[in-house]
């Protein structure tokens, strides 16, 4: 019987090899999809840790999570500096990290923030950001690069970079008159930090100080950089901010305060709850893909395995 099967397979070796190849591909796809799924979940889950709330302009929780943490999409609106200060000084708040987004550099997002970002931001298992070269920004036109930005653009310390207005990968509007200088490069994190250009909030304000119309100023209206540095560069608005509480038991009550804030419409989300919402959204697609690949795997032997004779 075994000899008969062996002869049959030999006589149909082309079909048998094709069947084995198809099965191998099906199994590889199944394993690959599962590995990608786990990798995506791990990457998303490790992007921010130790943050109790994320606050931004009123909108969907997923939208707020995606643009503030993952640099995906855009904010529906900004929130005022005064509102940020109100919650920064709240008795239940231990720390905050402000974010200002809206510009880019060769497709990489530019993030305006302050020194607390380098001191307090955590990712993964509450890991701190580390520098592979240089130091945090101190001047208005200093920039700190994520590891991928530095590697792919081949930047070194003291190199100049030009920021583009807006978030398009090929923006035609550039802040060419206000270049930044690379003063630091962060160590790899495996998070969106690696794909981010970090500048100070004052740097964001300085870039746009004569762009009131959203376009470059006419030559006669241009403000030179020496004059810019003499101005008050406190931002009028930011995009979002991270919140660390003195006690996690206050998370829901402060979230409610933010969501019912009378000065302007704001939203506060719990990062873990927003991530769970994202997993629920993706679960249907994941399940459908696994079913399709499983059916392919099951059907291949039935459809192509040669019958002994």
Language-model segments: what does each one mean?
Residues 1-10:
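A short amphipathic helical element positioned immediately N-terminal to and/or at the very start
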Residues 12-16, 47, 275-295:
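Loop-to-transmembrane-helix entry motif
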Residues 14-39:
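Short, strongly hydrophobic transmembrane alpha-helices
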Residues 32-119, 135-139, 230, 254, ...:
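Hydrophobic, regular-secondary-structure patches
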Residues 104-115, 124-216:
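Hydrophobic secondary-structure segments that place a key small or acidic residue at a functional site
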Residues 174-181, 185-286:
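Mechanotransmission and gating elements of multispan inner-membrane complexes involved in transport
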Residues 296-309:
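Residue-level detector of conserved catalytic or cofactor/ligand-binding positions
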């Amino acid at each position: 019987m075994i000899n008969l099967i062996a002869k049959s397979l030999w006589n149909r070796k082309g079909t048998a090899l094709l069947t084995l190849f198809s099965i191998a591909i099906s199994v590889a796809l199944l394993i690959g999809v599962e590995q990608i799924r786990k990798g995506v979940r791990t990457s998303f889950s490790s992007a921010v840790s130790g943050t109790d709330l994320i606050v931004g302009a009123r909108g969907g929780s997923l939208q707020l999570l995606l643009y503030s943490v993952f640099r995906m999409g855009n904010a529906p609106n900004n929130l005022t500096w005064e509102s940020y200060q109100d919650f920064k000084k709240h008795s239940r708040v231990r720390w905050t990290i402000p974010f200002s987004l809206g510009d880019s550099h060769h497709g990489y997002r530019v993030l305006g923030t302050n020194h607390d970002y380098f001191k307090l931001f955590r990712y993964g298992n509450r890991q701190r950001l580390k520098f592979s070269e240089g130091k945090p920004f101190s001047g208005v036109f200093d920039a700190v690069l994520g590891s991928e930005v530095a590697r792919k653009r081949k930047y070194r310390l003291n190199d100049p970079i030009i920021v583009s207005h807006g978030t398009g990968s090929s923006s035609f509007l550039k802040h060419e008159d206000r270049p930044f200088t690379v003063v630091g490069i962060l160590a790899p994190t495996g998070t969106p930090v690696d794909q981010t250009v970090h500048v100070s909030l004052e740097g964001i304000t300085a870039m746009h100080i004569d762009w009131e119309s959203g376009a470059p100023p006419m030559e006669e209206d241009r403000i030179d950089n020496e004059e810019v540095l003499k101005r008050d560069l406190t931002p009028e608005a930011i995009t979002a901010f991270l919140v660390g509480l003195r006690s996690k038991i206050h998370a829901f009550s402060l979230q409610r305060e933010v969501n019912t804030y009378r000065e302007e419409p704001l939203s506060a989300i719990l990062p873990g709850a927003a991530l769970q919402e994202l997993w629920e959204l993706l679960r249907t697609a994941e399940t459908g893909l696994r079913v399709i690949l499983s059916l392919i795997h099951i059907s291949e032997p039935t459809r192509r395995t040669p019958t002994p004779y």
